[in-house]
Amino acid sequence: LLQNSIKKLKSKKIKISVINTPGIFEIPITIKMNIKKFDAFVALGCVIKGDTPHFNLICSSTFDAIMQLSIKFDKPIGNGIITALNMRQAVERSGKIGSVKPNKGAEAAHAVLSILENDPKKI
C-alpha cells in the first residue's frame, strides 16, 4: 500500500511525509494533530475481520472520523484502508505480487491528487 501510494504521489512531484500509527483507530487523531502541516493526507492500513463485532465498530468509527476531518478542515484525505474478510482478500487489495485487484494505496493517492488538482482555491 505505502510503496504504491508513494510512487503515485512522487510521479506528480508531491512532497510527502510518512507518519505511522499503531493501528487504524489512531489514524484520525494523528491526522487531526497534523492537519495544519499538510495540504492533504492518504490514510493507509488494513483490518481483517475476526469473530467479534470489533471489526465493524473500528472500521465504521475510523472511516466516519476521517470523513468528518476532511469536511471540517477542508482537506482531502484519501482512504486506502483495506477492510477484508480474510488474508487472501487483504493481499489481493494491497497490490501484492500476483494480485489482480488494483492497489488501494495508489487509488487513495490518486483520489487525493484529483481533489488537489481541482481545488478552486488554487485557481
Predicted regions and their residues:
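Phosphate-binding/catalytic loops
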Residues: 85-102
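Glycine-rich phosphate-binding loop
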Residues: 29-66
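Short, acidic/small-residue loops that bind anionic groups at enzyme active sites
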Residues: 56-84, 102-104
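A charged, well-structured terminal subsegment
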Residues: 99-123
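Short, ordered loop/turn segments at secondary-structure junctions
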Residues: 21-24, 46-47, 82-86
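Glycine-rich phosphate/diphosphate-binding loop of Rossmann-like nucleotide-binding domains
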Residues: 1-18, 22
